Amino acid sequence: MFRVLVVGAGLTGSLCAALLRKEITAPLYLALWDKAGDIGGRMTTANSPHNPRCTADLGAQYITCTPHYAKKHQNFYEELLAHGILEPLTSPIKGMEVKEGESNFVAPHGVSSIIKYYLKESGAEVFLRQCVTQINLRDNKWEVSEDTGSTQQFDLVILTMPAPQILGLQGDIVNLISERQRQQLASVSYSSRYALGLFYEAGMKIDVPWAGQYITSNPCIRFISIDSKKRNTESSECGPLLVVHTTVPFGVTHLEHSEEDVQELITQQLETILPGLPPPVATKCWKWRYSQVTNSAANSPGQMTLHLNPFLIYI
């Protein structure tokens, strides 16, 4: 049986696994490893510790579809809309720039529901808290080691983690990647930011006319979302679910600070924008070290083949 490993349980990894299952008709074993404790990657949805049905998107807030990708990826959008995974964004987002021909969507069940859908379609065996440390070439197969020291062999490995993490891998991969590819990977850069989710008591109201707002005059906060209102999932069972995204400069400056200190700073700034908020019943602070790509690998749009036989691919 042909064995495939996909590293990374975000959108790229889950969709890649689903497409492999669809396109490969031969017997196929699909494994998906992620070093995190949950799936989603930059499409993470957090649950309230008091009520798991109360959720907040800490990563991507909505999906923007340009006319180009509406045509190129039409089947994907139609499929997700047909299954109720995506819905048109109808709630007001103050300060959002809407370009001609663009469409915006939200995931009513949380943005991680997109990843869950594709993982289910893929039939992949998912392993969390499994961090790849080495990739070696053994008898024309990839021997992949994780941080506990255990190894498994695969016929094909697809890496979907951030480029700096690939450059940190040990083993034969160090010498198998060409110097040109290494330079391309090293040139990839990312923005960094924090997200703070605040879960409030059921029955509490945040009386503002918007579901989300871009902030332009605060050194700390760039975006605020009343997440349940944005996704049209407000209910008497859950209180408001407030999500705050910081500015990139704030994220870079405080990247190595403790989450407790960062959360306190964000909360102080939030009070200046939405004064009088009661204490939340729970919070979740999330560091996005690799938030968005600001500089992609030159001449390798979308993917890079690191080794041909057997295949080792970076997407």
Curated annotation (Swiss-Prot):
UniProt keyword annotation of Nucleotide-binding present: no
Signal peptide, first to last residue: 1-17
Positions that bind FAD: T12, R42, Q61, Y62
Residue pairs linked by disulfide bridges in the UniProt entry: none
Pfam families, sorted: Amino_oxidase, NAD_binding_8
Keywords: FAD, Flavoprotein, NAD, NADP, Oxidoreductase, Secreted, Signal
Record PANTHER family: RENALASE (PTHR23357:SF1)
Function: Catalyzes the oxidation of the less abundant 1,2-dihydro-beta-NAD(P) and 1,6-dihydro-beta-NAD(P) to form beta-NAD(P)(+). The enzyme hormone is secreted by the kidney, and circulates in blood and modulates cardiac function and systemic blood pressure. Lowers blood pressure in vivo by decreasing cardiac contractility and heart rate and preventing a compensatory increase in peripheral vascular tone, suggesting a causal link to the increased plasma catecholamine and heightened cardiovascular risk.
Protein name: Renalase
Gene from which this protein is expressed: Rnls
